[in-house]
Curated annotation (Swiss-Prot):
Domain of life the protein comes from: Bacteria
Lineage: Bacteria, Bacillati, Bacillota, Bacilli, Lactobacillales
Record organism: Limosilactobacillus fermentum (strain NBRC 3956 / LMG 18251) (Lactobacillus fermentum)
Record's protein name: Imidazoleglycerol-phosphate dehydratase
Gene: hisB
Cellular component GO terms, alphabetical: cytoplasm
Keyword Amino-acid biosynthesis belongs to the record: yes
Main subcellular location of this protein, as a coarse class: cytoplasm
EC number: 4.2.1.19
Subcellular location as annotated: Cytoplasm
UniProt-listed Gene3D superfamilies: Imidazole glycerol phosphate dehydratase, domain 1
């Protein structure tokens, strides 16, 4: 099974993430940021991953450090769980509607870090979650996992729906990309390594 657990501690946050790519063995999310917990739960559910996230941070300041550092640790955990990437599909693409909103996420588990984020999030706050940190989360995730991640909202009105559709689409795109395909010889690259 492709699993990994990584812990990270700084003066601002203490985070532990356990990820199981092959079995939805349970989802337990506790970051202290309710809306963010909900989004991570959706990512895991729609990616069909087992995911445990335990995070504490300087929420008396704001949620930024907790959200961004969780993205870093989740990305590192994904990278470790993938191992040598032999026979993975590598690419994933998902479009997800959420009422009036349509979001698309495309990933490439290429070993090259890059984020394109195109979403207008007009409501600055959802509970204790500052919506501008959504992009920071995806940036941290993409760079720590060493993947290309293109996330965009094609249209929509409600900020909650936009972010929710992005997290669901990320889960679905990652599910495609991490899927093992026995027809692939070695890694899915002409270079022989990703």
């Amino acid at each position: 099974m492709r699993t990994a657990t990584i812990k990270r501690q700084t003066k601002e946050t203490q985070i532990e993430v356990s990820l199981n790519l092959d079995q939805q063995s349970g989802i337990q999310i506790d970051t202290g940021v309710g809306y963010f917990d909900h989004m991570l739960n959706l990512l895991a559910k729609h990616g069909r991953f087992g995911l445990v996230v335990k995070a504490t941070g300087d929420l008396e300041v704001d949620a930024h450090h907790t959200v961004e550092d969780t993205g870093i640790v989740l990305g590192e955990t994904l990278k470790e769980a993938l191992g040598d990437k032999v026979q993975i599909e590598r690419y994933g693409d998902a479009m997800v509607p959420m009422d009036e909103t349509l979001a698309q996420v495309v990933v490439d588990l290429s070993g090259r870090s890059y984020l394109v984020f195109d979403a207008e999030l007009t409501n600055p706050r959802l509970g204790s979650f500052e919506t501008e940190v959504t992009e920071d989360f995806f940036q941290a995730l993409a760079f720590a996992a060493e993947m290309n991640l293109h996330a965009r909202v094609l249209y929509g009105r409600n900020t909650h729906h936009k972010i929710e559709a992005l997290f669901k689409a990320t889960g679905r795109a990652l599910r495609q990309a991490v899927t093992i395909n026995p027809a692939i010889e070695g890694v899915n690259s002409t270079k022989g390594v990703i």
